[in-house]
A protein has these predicted regions:
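Conserved N-terminal segment of class I S-adenosyl-L-methionine
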Residues: 2-151, 291-293, 298, 314-331
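A short acidic, Gly/Pro-enriched loop at the edge of an enzyme's catalytic core
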Residues: 149-159
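Catalytic cores of eukaryotic secretory-pathway lumenal/extracellular enzymes that build
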Residues: 130, 170-176, 194-195, 199-204
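Conserved class I S-adenosyl-L-methionine
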Residues: 188-227, 231-234
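A short SAM/SAH-binding and catalytic strip from SAM-dependent methyltransferases
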Residues: 159-171
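A short glycine-rich, Lys/Arg-flanked "PGG" loop and its adjoining helix->strand segment in the class I
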Residues: 173-185
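C-terminal lobe and adjacent flexible extensions of AdoMet/dcAdoMet transferase-like proteins
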Residues: 266-331
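SAM-dependent methyltransferase
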Residues: 218-289
């Protein structure tokens, strides 16, 4: 464990396994962070605590392909800021000088908002999407790491934020416990999760077409998946667009079409933007290695089991589960 004298002033990384403080060193011209026993490479100014190739590779490709698509600064919209505000459920001005951990940052759609409001931000992602985020936010402290083996001190962050990630981890409940470990007592945990209901876990006609397409897509070699998904998307998107004003036809289409189509749920600017956002999220939903669903009750029960307080969870406008909890001072 880290000695008490380091607890408040140390701002760097620790070994994910031993919690020893890591020091930067140069070996044969290459930079590393190292402890007594372990060392981790720094590549393109980003510390890497995982193998560069892992189950999140498709996400890494996705966020490099769509590096700016969902950035408010690029779209001219406030979609990401509004979602962040809704999940955190606090004034974003309260983020100023707060030590915030963003778990699963992708290309940085929320990173730029957190930085804008003055958060002392640390971000990480399992995939090499961290490189896209670093390009979008050059001053960001960021690393490539696993949510189950994070290189951070325990009881350190004021706020831990995890949006769009837990459902893609091997064990969402264990991931929540790990997030709580690095959160200060009385700190704020803000998370979301895919919602468990019949439509999300059964095949058509009760469920959606994603149930049928995804297992087939995952059988395809990773390097070919995007091309296949784009062909599927390009077939279905014109049909969705033609009937974009009919909610009834859109409901029918979801039983046979696997694509995401946001005309009735997001106020995007034009057809190209609907196309780009739809293709991005269609790729996301068809290539995720893990896909879990939980009810509000399941999430709340697990947080109660971990002695969290002020637990506030609900079904969000996009039909997911999201909310906040306060870490117990006595955990």
């Amino acid at each position: 464990m880290i000695k008490n004298k380091y607890k408040k002033k140390f701002l760097g990384y620790v070994c994910p396994f031993t919690k020893e403080i890591l020091k930067k060193t140069c070996i044969n011209g290459n930079l590393f962070l190292r402890s007594y026993k372990n060392k981790y490479p720094i590549i393109n100014e980003i510390p890497r605590f995982v193998e560069l190739k892992n189950y999140a590779n498709d996400f890494g490709f996705q966020w490099k392909k769509f590096r700016k698509t969902q950035l408010d600064s690029f779209s001219g919209l406030t979609v990401s800021e509004e979602r962040l505000q809704r999940v955190l459920n606090i004034p974003l001005t309260d983020l100023k000088k707060k030590k915030v951990l963003e778990a699963g940052c992708g290309s940085g759609r929320f990173s730029e908002i957190l930085l804008k409001y003055g958060a002392v931000l640390t971000s990480f992602d399992l995939s090499d999407a961290v490189e896209s985020n670093k390009l979008n936010n050059p001053s960001l402290k960021i690393c490539q790491a696993n949510i189950l083996e994070m290189p951070f001190q325990n009881d350190y962050f004021d706020i831990v934020l995890c949006i769009g990630v837990l459902q893609h981890t091997p064990n969402p409940e264990k991931s929540i416990e790990k997030l709580l470990e690095v959160l200060k007592p009385k700190g704020l945990l803000a998370i979301d999760h895919y919602r468990r209901k019949w439509r999300n876990i059964l095949p058509p006609p009760i469920g959606t077409a994603t149930f049928l397409y995804r297992p087939i897509i995952l059988l395809i070699k990773s390097k070919y998946r995007f091309k296949v998904i784009k062909k599927i998307f390009d077939f279905w998107f014109p049909i969705h667009w033609k009937f974009r004003k009919s909610k009834f036809i859109q409901r029918l289409l979801r039983r046979i079409s696997p694509i995401h189509f946001y005309f009735n749920s997001l106020n995007l600017k034009n057809k190209k933007m609907f196309y780009d956002w739809g293709l991005l999220d269609t790729h996301d939903s068809l290539t995720d290695f893990y896909k879990h669903h939980r009810t509000v009750k399941q999430i709340v029960s697990h947080l109660q089991y971990n002695k969290c307080q002020q637990i506030k969870f609900y079904i969000n406008p996009m039909d997911g589960v999201e909310g906040t909890a306060i870490k117990s001072q006595n955990k």
